[in-house]
A protein has these predicted regions:
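N-terminal helicase ATP-binding lobe
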Residues: 1-172
Length: 172
C-alpha cells in the first residue's frame, strides 16, 4: 500500500502567504495541518494570531507549539502560564471577535484553524459576523491561512472574503 503523506511533507515551511494573500489548507483530520502551520510560524518574521473554535483545540495547539519550538512537554494545567513568545497570540474565535479592535490595521499572519466551525456559525452568530467583517477590512495588512477538514461548507464564504481583494488563492 501507499504510505500516508502529511501536509508538512507537501507544503514547504517557506510557503507562507505574503500580506494581502491567503491560503486554504483542506485535508482530513490527522493529516498534519497543525504541524505544517507550526513549521510556518517558526519561519515567519510576521507576528502571528492563531485562532480556533474551542479551548481544547487551543490547548492542543499550545502544547504542540511549545514542544516543537522549545522541546518542552508541558502539562495541560500549566499551558496558560507559559508564553508562546512575544510574536504569537493564540486565542479562540470568540476572543478574537471581542478584541478585533486591538488588531485592526496591524500586520499579522492569521491562522484560522477549524475555520468551518466559524463559518457554519456565520448565519446565527454575532461573533462570526464580526470576524468576517474584520477579515474583509484587513485583507491588505494580513496574510491568512485557513485550515479545515471540511472545505465544501466553507469555500464559498472564504471566496467571498478573499476575492474582493483581487488576490488569487492558493488552494491545497
Amino acid at each position: 500500500g501507499t504510505s500516508k503523506q502529511y501536509i508538512s511533507q507537501i507544503i514547504d515551511s517557506n510557503d507562507i502567504p505574503s500580506l494581502g494573500e491567503s491560503m486554504l489548507i483542506a485535508s482530513p483530520t490527522g493529516s498534519g495541518k497543525t504541524s505544517a502551520v507550526i513549521k510556518m510560524i517558526k519561519h515567519t518574521s510576521m507576528p502571528v494570531i492563531y485562532v480556533t473554535n474551542r479551548k481544547m483545540t487551543l490547548c492542543q495547539f499550545k502544547k504542540d507549539y511549545i514542544k516543537a519550538s522549545k522541546g518542552l512537554d508541558v502539562p495541560a494545567e500549566l499551558l496558560d502560564s507559559i508564553s508562546l513568545g512575544e510574536n504569537i497570540i493564540a486565542i479562540t474565535y470568540q476572543e478574537l471577535a471581542e478584541t478585533t479592535y486591538k488588531y485592526k490595521g496591524k500586520k499579522y499572519l492569521l491562522i484560522l484553524d477549524e475555520v468551518h466551525c466559524l463559518l457554519e456559525d456565520a448565519n446565527f452568530s454575532v461573533y462570526a459576523e464580526k470576524i468576517i467583517r474584520y477579515l474583509k477590512a484587513n485583507r491588505d495588512n494580513t496574510a491568512r491561512i485557513y485550515l479545515t477538514a471540511t472545505p465544501d461548507a466553507v469555500t464559498p464564504v472564504i471566496a467571498e472574503i478573499e476575492c474582493e481583494s483581487g488576490q488569487e488563492q492558493a488552494l491545497f
